[in-house]
Amino acid sequence: MLDSLKVTPRQVTGSGPAAGQSTLAPAPELPEPAVAGWRPRRQNARRVLALAALLPLTVILAVKAASLGTQVFVNAYGMGVLGATILVMYVSFGNYRDPSEDATTLTARPLVSCLVAVRDELAVIETTIRSLLNQTYGNCEVIVVDDFSTDGTREMLTALAERLPFTFIALDRNVGKKRALVRAVEASAGAYYVFTDSDCIVGADAVERCMLAFQAHPGIGAVSGHARALNSDKNLLTRMQDVWYDGQFGVSKAAESVFRSVTCVSGPLAAFRREAIYNYLPAWAGDRFLGAEFRFATDRQLTGYVLGQYWIGRKLKHQYQNSPFVSAVDYPERKWGVAYVASARAWTNVPDTFGRVLRQQTRWKKSFIRNLFFTGAFYWRRGVLASALFYGHGLWVLLAPLLAFRHLVWLPLHGQFLLTALYLGGVLLKGSIWGLAYRFQNRGDGRWIYRPLMSVLSATVLSWLLIYSLLTLRRSVWSRG
């Protein structure tokens, strides 16, 4: 065990009736198996042409802005952002294929360890556990680690573990999400790991879809599922985030998956081969940045070890050679692929107040900064097009607050309101392109209209959080919002 994990856990292994028979509460109604309602996306010329047809509009917008005397750099940035958006969609809609579709049935069912770290999630954690126990895959073990909850979560889980078949570990001090999950791995026996956040519901067939992808593609070391907002109907903010989630997974991750280089296997549903991450867990749990422990970047950082281990793995294992995660077994460094499985579904509770959105986005931007230094150091080796997506996105995020200041503050102060209007028009255009993509993937769903609103919120408010995140980078608190 890692030195910093030397806590005194209390462990309870459930041996009671199966899920659905708890005497504490009836089993919640779970969404139907994801694949049952999912429409596979093949190469579709009409969709590609519809998206590509927007490219001339992007050029016209840039030319018009240039004719008004703005700087070449600013025009190139705006044109680049819109052009890159269309390129990502072209790659996604024209080339993505769900890797789980390449295997019709499972020829074997090795043990899968489903792992959850929880802190103060009394209202939702039982639902999360039940969704894992209800998996169609069958051969799963569920391990839940409580990271020193103070809201009654620990007591509830202690009682629940006597009635449902899962292993519960209670830590006697708060160690952070990464270290709590490493403790779960130590107690596991599976050849594959499935992580989910403690406020999520995992589709009944999600583990099976991930395992089909692993079986069909031995070179894939990790896969991300598809996440939507569980509480999307609550208010305007949750609906905006739900539509945004759909695009981030169904378009952005799909495009990265074409190159087998998904940069973030996200928390709602993240699956890994044991051999792809086991040796790097001490480096992950003990990650330090700018001289301090860095508790964020849990998903991105772990994905980075899969993507980059061929180039950085040996050095990391040497650094942690005394850890049992390295000394007990030494897996070879491989050029693993990382993919996205669209038919593996999960639902997560998104922030439902503006303050919670800001706190979550701040946490994510801190993770982005850390990941830019870590993954950015080797990602260029993943190929030209994959690298263009990664570094182009990084450049866009870094420049976004500067462009927002210029167009929303500096130019209006100097009376150039037309340029501000053009900037906001470009933001709305970009959001509308994403909204169109949402319509393509969700026929008959009118929520696409919320996507342009999310783009405006991101450009005018959320982009500024990058500066605040930089200033508070060393402040590390595990909080969901």
Question: Where are the model-predicted features located?
Answer:
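Short, charged juxtamembrane terminal tails flanking transmembrane helices
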Residues: 477-481
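Non-transmembrane catalytic domains and loops of membrane-associated enzymes and transporters
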Residues: 2-16, 24, 104-379
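N-proximal low-complexity "stem/linker" segments adjacent to membrane-targeting elements
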Residues: 24-127
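Loop-to-transmembrane boundary segments
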Residues: 36-47, 380-395
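Membrane-helix boundary/interface segments in integral membrane proteins
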Residues: 20-38, 375-377, 404-408
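A general structural signal for short secondary-structure boundary/capping elements
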Residues: 268-273, 288, 386-394, 407-408
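Membrane-embedded multi-pass helical conduit in multi-pass membrane proteins
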Residues: 59-97, 104-106, 389-476
